[in-house]
Amino acid sequence: MEIIWIVMIMIGIIMFYVAEIGAYFWHRFGAHTEIIDKVSLNTLKVKQTHDIHHTIIDDEAHADFFYVCFLLFFYLVFLYLLFYYDYLSFSWLLVLYLPVFITLVWNWYVHSAYHQEDHWLSKYEWFKHDKFLHMNHHIDPNCNYGIATHFTDEILDTMSYS
């Protein structure tokens, strides 16, 4: 019985990384290319709304968060169907969903804070550093796709400190 909890914790941690990597690819290829717009027959306009965010510095990209909510909803429906048809226990549903939900909501919250002048997080050095990296992304949209973390930028060589 104890081993299952250890496995669940490990899977939960892995799901955090899966969500961060997914957010990186969504941002890099979903928001900065027209891939999703073309697949959706131009109904979603992800690149268009993200371009607006890049041109108006105090825009907190709430339109982008709509897409995150959309993805989280359909991921939850998928997991719920697995649960409903007894392919997944409720505990596993939580282990697979909560880390992704928390990671993506945290990314959105931190991202919104980057675009607010006197946010309460501004007193922390880590936040100032990450805000600097994010604002570099607005200057050069070909780097620093990470939002709350930048380990994927480091791994995929898209990190820029200048």
PLM features: residue spans?
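N-terminal cleavable signal peptides for secretion/export
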Residues: I11-I14
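Feature marks short, highly hydrophobic, charge-poor N-terminal signal-anchor/signal peptide-like helices
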Residues: M1-I9
